[in-house]
Amino acid sequence: MSDQVLSALEHFFLRWQRDGEARRGLPLCEWEADWRSPCELDEPREGRVAWRPHQRQQAADFAAMANALELVLHPAAQALFGHWFSRPIPCSYKGLRLEIILPWNEADLNLLRENLIGHLLMLRKLKRTPSLFIATTRNEMTLVSLDNESGQVWLEWLDSGRRLTLAPSLPAFLERLETLPH
């Protein structure tokens, strides 16, 4: 499963880069001296820096997080969050605009872990099955999530607990994403 996720993610990044760079060149983001990333390509100019998703040399370890939660994290989530650094990637899935969530640097990965822990604890308190958010939508109460048990990708309404299956797996979801301008 992890290899399939990594392959689908890499293909998505390549499509996103090709389409975006053909339209506007390299993506730019605000440069922050105390929030550097291996994604940065050049020196900053006028407070902005060009960037691209950057593959980590060594996968991030989620064992401590899983042990603290007494939960086995789905390998697809570990593959998604543990192998690349990136800004959020704007895209769409069957017309639904969203941003794939990925960590920008090691400190951001730690914040992501903390937010995932909070999300999982909230779901546990509400007696819902565990899911891991993987993308945001325009509605802050609606997330794209990975079902931690089955690996299905859901559209999840946090306020009601409603869940709609978008794809049978994370690789299938990633393969159907459409790129948006960056």
Swiss-Prot record:
InterPro entries: Syd, Syd_sf. The keyword Membrane applies. Interacts with the SecY protein in vivo. May bind preferentially to an uncomplexed state of SecY, thus functioning either as a chelating agent for excess SecY in the cell or as a regulatory factor that negatively controls the translocase function. GO terms for cellular component: cytoplasmic side of plasma membrane. This is Protein Syd. HAMAP family: Syd. It is a peripheral membrane protein. It comes from Aeromonas salmonicida (strain A449). Belongs to the Syd family. It comes from the Bacteria. Its main location: membrane. CDD domains: Syd. Keywords: Cell inner membrane, Cell membrane, Membrane. The gene is syd. It is found in: Cell inner membrane. The keyword Cell wall biogenesis/degradation does not apply.
